[in-house]
Every structure is written in structure tokens, then in C-alpha cells.
Amino acid sequence: MNLKVLFLLAMVLVTLCLGEDRVTDRRQLCKCCAKLCHEDRDRTIPCSGGNSQFCEFCKRTKQKIRKDCNTQNEAKALCVGYFTGEC
């Protein structure tokens, strides 16, 4: 009985930690993508986060990028900042 409880607690902690990592990665990737789009550079340049797939958003409209990042206020702010030249 106690082992089941401990196992469930461990799973919850692991899930929370992985979730936070994903949020951080998403912010970094969004920032990278926004910068590439704003500078109109080669969009095949890999992101610093090691996940260049996210930069495929650069092939869409800037409004679409803002929409994709809308779930994370910080990421959205980074994108908008790059588009307006504030970063």
C-alpha cells in the first residue's frame, strides 16, 4: 500500500519537473524563432535549444507565431519584442 502511494508521488513529481522543462524550452524556442523571423535570416539555422523544428513557425505569418506563443505570456512578450525591435 505504501509503495503504491510513493510510486504515485514520484510520478507526479517527475511529471511536474518535465512539464516545467517543456515550458522553459518553449520560451527559448519561441525567442529563437521570433529573432530569426524578425531579422529575416536563414530559417534553417538551428535554435539554441537544440530543437530546430519549432523554428518551422518562421515559415508561417508573424500573427500565427504570436498565436502559438499566446499560452505563455513571457514567450509572447519575447516574440512581440523581437517583432517591434525592442529586443
From Swiss-Prot:
A GO cellular component annotation in the UniProt record: extracellular region
GO molecular function: toxin activity
Propeptide span(s): 22-27
Post-translational modification, as annotated: Contains 5 disulfide bonds.
Subcellular location field: Secreted
UniProt entry tagged with the keyword Acetylation: no
UniProt keyword annotations, A-Z: Cleavage on pair of basic residues, Disulfide bond, Secreted, Signal, Toxin
Family listed: Belongs to the teretoxin C (TC) superfamily.
Tissue distribution: Expressed by the venom duct.
Species of provenance: Terebra anilis
Signal peptide: 1-21
Comment field on protein domains: The cysteine framework is C-CC-C-C-C-C-C-C-C.
UniProt keyword Disulfide bond, yes or no: yes
Record's protein name: Tan_10cys
